[in-house]
Design a protein with these regions (language model features):
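Helix-rich, typically C-terminal accessory recognition domains appended to large enzymatic cores
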Residues: 43-208
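Conserved phosphate-binding loops in nucleotide/dinucleotide-binding enzymes
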Residues: 2-52, 66-77, 196
Length: 208
């Protein structure tokens, strides 16, 4: 017989029935969700616990769309923690926008933004959502370091806004709230990347 996870508890390192601790439960391999197997998930409960964006982020990041995902509440919790990191980063960016530094031309930021936009646009068209999630992690790492460079307010706000718009299909609630906090509420259009800014500038140095 199939047993619901809610009917099981851990006692002295063993998984047993809550109703009768003398009966040990055998855990089988991962199965597809089915009411008869009592392994379905209540989406409302998960969304209430972690938020819709975290659930969406987990589902899209787990595997390519043509493959089945392996449901994991630990995975959703990890996605939720990452979104919290994005919120912390957003607060730092808002603070930098308000202070309006003027020490960096923003060349690295502009180039990164347009490369990011190309990645997101191309992978949305290819339904490669897991690649998009990886790009969002790269964006987080980039901004976490670059925020110290003290860009001008306009440069930082303009490029960060483009990035927020581009990630709306993946984490819409987060992106929309961030745009509202930046007072961007009208005429939101999909950002286009500049091909000229995708090129890397290399200098050949003769070694003697």
């Amino acid at each position: 017989n199939w047993i619901s996870p809610e009917e099981i508890e851990l006692v002295e390192g063993k998984k047993v029935l809550k109703s009768n601790n003398s009966i040990e439960v055998k855990v089988g391999p991962i199965e597809s969700m089915s009411k008869s197997k009592k392994n379905t998930i209540d989406p409302e409960k998960i969304i209430n616990n972690y938020g819709a964006d975290a659930v969406r982020l987990f589902i899209l990041s787990d595997s390519p769309p043509e493959k089945d995902i392996q449901w994991s509440e630990e995975g959703i919790a990890s996605s939720s923690k990452f979104i919290q990191k994005l919120w912390t980063l957003h607060s730092k960016i808002l603070d930098a926008v308000d202070k309006n530094y003027n020490k960096d031309s923003g060349e690295n930021l502009v180039k990164f933004t347009h490369k990011f936009l190309k990645k997101i646009t191309d992978n949305l068209n290819n339904f490669s959502y897991n690649v998009i999630i990886a790009s969002i992690h790269e964006m987080y790492s980039f901004f976490s370091k670059e925020i110290e460079n003290e860009y001008t307010s306009d440069t930082l706000k303009e490029n960060y806004t483009k990035i927020l718009i581009s990630i709306m299909p993946v984490i819409p609630h987060f992106a929309n709230e961030c745009l509202n906090l930046l007072n961007i509420k009208k005429n939101i259009k999909w950002p286009e990347y500049n091909v000229a800014l995708l090129e890397e500038n290399f200098v050949n140095i003769v070694v003697q």
